[in-house]
A protein has these predicted regions:
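Short glycine/proline- and aromatic-enriched beta-strand/turn motifs that initiate or cap beta-hairpins
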Residues: 1-43
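Transmembrane beta-strands of outer-membrane beta-barrel pores
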Residues: 2-5, 28, 39-43, 72-78, ...
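Outer-membrane pore/translocation modules
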Residues: 13-16, 39-132, 203
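Outer-membrane beta-barrel architecture
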Residues: 23, 54-58, 89-94, 132-136, ...
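Repeated loop/turn-to-beta-strand initiation elements of outer-membrane beta-barrel proteins
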Residues: 30-35, 62-70, 98-104, 140-149, ...
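One face of beta-strands
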Residues: 33-37, 51-55, 152, 172-176
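Outer-membrane beta-barrel transmembrane domain signature
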Residues: 109-187, 194, 214-216
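Outer-membrane beta-barrel "beta-signal"
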Residues: 204-216
Length: 216
């Protein structure tokens, strides 16, 4: 796929990015699991590339729609440094159907990173709270199948060192995606990637991502 940091509503001056992504998901009666891995900045030398791995699960509690929620989100950057976010908390799976789904969660935030503040020390350790969700809406337009989806996380009360690194006590991280299933197993997607005081950026920023994918 192709991404451009400079073509959203905010020009964050990070240029163009070529990327490769693979994802996997499975649903059981008792639990569900989703993960992805992506390699970014493939149009740059190895020293400027980065990689992201994420894994998320909901495990139902006592056959109810309430869940134990867990997630890891790791970024390994050859120039900026490494960062691993770990969330543990509770979620809900009761809002779903043929129309799509809305799956909220809330949790504690534990962080492991390379950044060391001269004033506050390491970012690693307790890092506040997270409120988030994943959502999708399925619809048909002009005889074509589309999915509008969103993932969103609000980070609250982050530690002093991470606040210094990310330019704020609270932060926002997410992406709004429109997917067109234009052929069996093939889809094209456009994602509006948004963030605030996250990804090492001061204030609100965004990115446009264009992908073509195949489902196995």
């Amino acid at each position: 796929g192709y991404a451009d940091w400079n073509s959203g509503f905010v020009n964050v001056h990070r240029g163009e990015v070529w990327k490769v992504t693979a994802d996997f998901g499975v649903n059981f009666k008792e639990a569900e699991f989703y993960s992805f891995i992506e390699s970014n900045v493939l149009n740059h030398a190895v020293a400027g590339r980065n990689h992201t791995v994420s894994a998320m699960t909901h495990v139902r509690l006592f056959d109810s729609d309430y869940t134990f929620f867990g997630k890891i989100y790791g970024q390994w950057d050859n120039s900026w440094g490494d960062d691993l976010d770990m969330f543990y908390g509770a979620g809900y799976l009761g809002w779903s159907g043929s129309w799509g789904f809305f799956k909220p969660y809330i949790g504690l935030h534990n962080q492991s990173g390379d950044y060391v503040s001269q004033k506050y020390g390491q970012t690693s350790g307790w890092n506040g709270y997270v409120i988030g969700w994943t959502a999708a809406y399925n619809f048909n337009l002009f005889g074509e199948d589309f999915v509008l989806s969103d993932w969103n996380e609000i980070e609250l009360d982050r530690n002093d060192a991470y606040t210094e690194q990310q330019f704020g006590r609270n932060g926002l991280n997410g992406g709004l995606t429109l997917a067109w299933k234009f052929y069996p197993r093939w889809k094209a997607t456009v994602t509006y990637r948004y963030f605030a005081n996250k990804l090492g950026y001061d204030g609100y920023g965004d990115q446009m991502i264009y992908m073509v994918g195949y489902s196995f």
